[in-house]
């Protein structure tokens, strides 16, 4: 709960205009709202503060034809017209809205990042929007100025870097090297040290991390569960448990993590109801998992509705159950 009240709560979203060059560049003609919460008691309205709590907000929006949903953001506009990009925001296609978590009520709008590299290898890929999502938020970079390499394997060093950036880790806080195979000047070095120190990922031995080794899908599940747990996130059980056709091939140490991440809607199966536990986790799959994680943190119910599995195939979930056959109202 946001707060203890004895009256009715009303969330007000008032369209507003903010004039500054920074707002014009970030938001343009997209919606901007002054968002407030009020308690109504005995006919009197009183403004409500979050007082250290958070609230999930959705701003309805239909992307323009030239806009990529993965590049849409929620932005906060302060009293001086300065824009703060909210990295933990996402355009949810099922809700047709930009969703985000607010720590205070204020002026919020919808921003768009135009400066995303024009990758030549993502246009026809099922995870295109997810890849643009992670790049626009600085979680992952392209493999060149024009390529993302969606089907290339995700290395341990790359993965912990993305997670560290998502967590807002300050690299200067983790400069002391913990592993002999992690060079101090490697881009992933501080994030490896952070991940090992916090228990998100262990080394392959006491002195090695194997940063250039690809992770497989069951390892990705374990790391994501560790990440959520260590950072204090609640892992929801939104979806029914899936009995994958290859469940017997999931390692005993990964079974609980696979189940947990699948029920939360963070990881999914692939073609023919397989999980492919030993298959290499690709950059496209990791981008998809990171975006799902952000959306689940904002609103666990984003696991319902139309969703793609980890092969890009669409399914529909209602109240946590997979809907089979024709859909009707």
Give the residues covered by each predicted segment.
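Short strand-edge motifs at loop-to-beta-strand transitions and within beta-strands
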Residues: 96-98
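A short amphipathic alpha-helical interaction element
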Residues: 131-134, 159-163, 195, 224, ...
